[in-house]
A protein has these predicted regions:
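An active-site-proximal "capping" alpha-helix that borders the catalytic cofactor pocket
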Residues: 252-283
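Positively charged, proline/Ser/Thr-rich regional signature most characteristic
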Residues: 1-55
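Flexible, polar/low-complexity N-terminal or interdomain linker segments that lie immediately upstream
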Residues: 1-21, 91-119, 328-369
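Conserved beta-strand hairpin/beta-sheet module of binuclear metal-dependent hydrolase folds
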Residues: 99-150, 227-237, 242-243
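Catalytic cysteine-centered active loop of the rhodanese-like fold, especially the PTP/DSP P-loop
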Residues: 30, 41-88
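Active-site environment of divalent metal-dependent phosphoester hydrolases
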Residues: 64, 141, 162-167, 188-191, ...
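Accessory terminal helices/loops
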Residues: 18, 70-78, 269-280, 287-370
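Active-site HxH/HxHxD metal-binding segment of metal-dependent hydrolases
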Residues: 128-131, 136-216
Length: 370
């Protein structure tokens, strides 16, 4: 309904602070507790917001929006629907976007986790009928389905780094398929406590005639790597976005963020910006506003850019090193919710208690850009 021309009013029944922190664009906030009286004030707010449209109610998990819908029906509203799983299910909605490639044998699919702006990839060879998955999220079935529909068998799973904003699905997917799981060789320095196959700088993975080269790009994290796909696309993880660059204090801490910024500057200028202008940059995230809009582009459209365009348009890439470091350190965006706990999970030092905790930890947008 959100992407159609159908007219309706979306009512978010969560408390105001939850609504302000993360919501769907266009939603009207009418906080509701089933134990409280449904007074005239709520009715008036709904009448003002709906303007006669059908009403769709949403909450965190469907627990308050369902009785809210019953209350509306008792008051004469006959066109009321409820989002069954609430914002929790909204956080699991994906778009699959094909990437145009010069090599007809090369397949690149961008999987967009719409509510969080997480971007993962299926990269494969049509001739070899094989693929790797890069930066998968916990909803691993989405990646398996995308690969299967493209006629590709997943042979390996790769992460660009230890993520701080969401729980990686990398190990889970590799285990489900009994295939190798890879991180950059410096992941051991982050205290990673599970088995993985390290990729060294310059190491290449072949899928038939398609080659994926590992490039060390420390900065956002020390173990960060980018993956150069057949010389035409760079999967940048949290090194370079289409609207910014990666922040550095999530691993290094506020006191040592300058060290991370220096590493990031070197990675950008000595590695990423040394590539041809025609290289397509495919990032690991797109920033999402509190009301669930992409900072650049739109859901279902490719999030990416020519490196040459970013070189010209992204001010941060034109700064000298001192200016760059100062800008990164001075800029202090809100940290991702629960990022320290998420890092514990992604290094394997402290697994989630259960699926419920994992879901709660991931609610809300990502905040990995500087």
């Amino acid at each position: 309904m959100i992407d159609s021309d159908e007219s309706f009013t979306l009512v978010d029944t969560r408390p105001e602070d939850s609504y302000e922190g993360w919501r769907i664009h266009g939603a009207e906030n009418v906080p509701f507790d089933p134990h409280d009286e449904f007074g005239d004030e709520k009715t008036e707010r709904i009448e003002a917001a709906s303007n006669g449209d059908s009403i769709v109610a949403i909450c965190g998990k469907g627990l308050t929006s369902t009785p809210f819908g019953f209350e509306l029906e008792q008051r004469g509203y006959d066109d009321v629907a409820v989002v069954k799983g609430g914002m929790e299910d909204w956080s699991k909605v994906y778009e699959v976007v094909p990437v145009e490639t010069a090599n007809e044998d090369l397949v690149v699919l961008q999987l967009q986790r719409r509510a969080k702006g997480c971007l993962g990839y299926v990269v494969g060879s049509t001739a070899a009928e094989s693929a790797v998955v890069v930066d998968p999220t916990r909803q691993t079935d989405q990646f398996k389905i995308a690969a299967e529909e493209a006629g590709l068998a997943i042979e390996r799973v790769l992460d660009t780094h230890v993520h701080a904003d969401h729980i990686s699905g990398g190990r889970k997917l590799a285990s489900e398929l009994d295939v190798p799981y890879h991180l950059g060789e410096r992941a051991s320095e982050r205290g990673v406590e599970y088995d993985y196959e390290p990729l060294v700088d310059g190491e290449t993975i072949a899928l038939g005639d398609v080659e994926i080269e590992t490039l060390q790009t420390p900065g956002h994290t020390t173990e960060m790597v980018n993956y150069l796909v057949d010389g035409e696309a760079l999967l940048t993880g949290d090194t370079l976005f289409v609207e910014s660059v990666g922040r550095t204090e999530l691993q290094f801490g506020d006191e040592d963020a300058a060290n991370g910024a220096e590493l990031l500057y070197e990675s950008l200028h000595d590695t990423v910006l040394e590539l041809p202008d025609e290289t397509r940059i495919l990032p690991g995230h797109v920033s999402v506003t509190a009301d669930n809009r992409y900072e650049v582009g739109s859901p279902g459209e490719l999030i990416g850019a020519r490196l040459g365009d970013l070189r010209d348009d992204l001010e941060l890439l034109g700064l000298d090193e001192d200016e760059f470091v100062d800008r990164i350190v001075e800029n202090d965006p809100e940290k991702p919710p629960n990022y320290e706990r998420v890092i514990e999970i992604n290094t394997g030092t402290e697994p989630p208690d259960d699926e419920s905790e994992a879901t709660e930890l991931e609610l809300g947008p990502n905040n990995c850009a500087a």
